[in-house]
Design a protein with these regions (language model features):
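Acidic-and-aromatic substrate-binding clefts and catalytic sites of carbohydrate-active enzymes
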Residues: 7-15, 35-40, 158
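Acidic (Asp/Glu)-rich catalytic clusters
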Residues: 19-21, 48-52, 168-171
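A glycine-rich, often tryptophan-bearing local segment used as a flexible ligand/cofactor-contacting loop or short
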Residues: 35-115
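Oxidoreductase and adenylate-handling cofactor-binding alpha/beta cores
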Residues: 81-90, 119-123, 130-135, 196-211
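Structural recognition of the beta-strand scaffold that forms the well-ordered cores
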Residues: 1-4, 26-31, 50, 55-60, ...
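Aromatic-Pro/Gly-enriched surface loop or interdomain linker
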Residues: 1-25, 210-211, 216-222
Length: 222
């Protein structure tokens, strides 16, 4: 595991600077929050692993990492600021307030979510969807924000938002398996057995060790 103690959004992992850094990895879990890392050469060396067939599991803030230029707008395929989003399979640029998210699994036949029950999180961040870049939806989230009145009496009306919150993608010439979920801002969510089951299944799927019934292949589960 590579850990960077940076508390901001500029974590730099020395391992990512090395040629062939990924040669001994079966899968890479991206759980970094690197929104202000904007060096294309550094990012391309990360992406090289996935172009060459190493699967990825992307969690929460990984979706808002390695972005620059006019990333708030839909990126154009092939541009240097599009490559990270192309690996993810979906472009997201921001989120709303922390409120519970009602998660509904949409692809009932995917082994990643087969048999999983819909559930509602504790307060979480619902990441927006700017555009889909190959993602295959597994789950969507609905977040309702209640009416709010500030100290001056100004009222912000109640609202609701929908977004894809879990998906798969096939990336690059080798159609590398990619699993991503935007859920997971708070520890209470990450500790939830339902969240852990989803991520574990996504990881097993990415490395080809998840059976059609949603159970781990022999030797890869409890």
């Amino acid at each position: 595991m590579a850990y960077d103690a940076t508390k901001g959004t500029k974590p730099v992992f020395e391992i990512y600077k090395k040629d062939g850094w990924y040669k001994d990895f079966d899968v890479v879990v991206h759980d970094e929050c690197a929104a202000d890392i904007t060096d294309p050469t550094y990012v391309e060396n990360i992406l090289k692993a996935h172009r060459e067939g190493v699967p990825a599991v992307n969690l929460h803030c990984a979706m808002h990492s390695y972005r620059w230029g006019k990333f708030q707008q839909p990126v154009k395929a092939g541009d240097d600021n599009a490559h990270w989003y192309e690996m993810l399979g979906l472009q997201s640029t921001g989120h709303g307030p922390q409120q519970p998210i009602a998660i509904a699994f949409t692809d009932k036949e995917s082994p990643i979510v087969k048999g999983l029950a819909d559930w509602t999180t504790v307060n979480e961040e619902l990441y927006n969807n700017v555009q889909i870049l190959g993602a295959k939806t597994l789950a969507k989230g609905l977040q309702k924000v209640p009416e709010k009145k500030d100290k001056k009496g100004k009222v912000t009306p109640a609202s609701e938002a929908n977004a894809i919150v879990a998906w798969t993608n096939e990336f690059g010439p080798k159609k590398t398996r990619i699993f991503s979920t935007t859920i997971g801002h708070n520890n209470a969510t990450v500790e939830d057995a339902r969240y852990l089951d989803l991520v574990a299944r996504g990881l097993l799927w990415s490395v080809g060790k998840l059976e059609a019934d949603g159970k781990a292949s022999a030797g890869f589960g409890k």
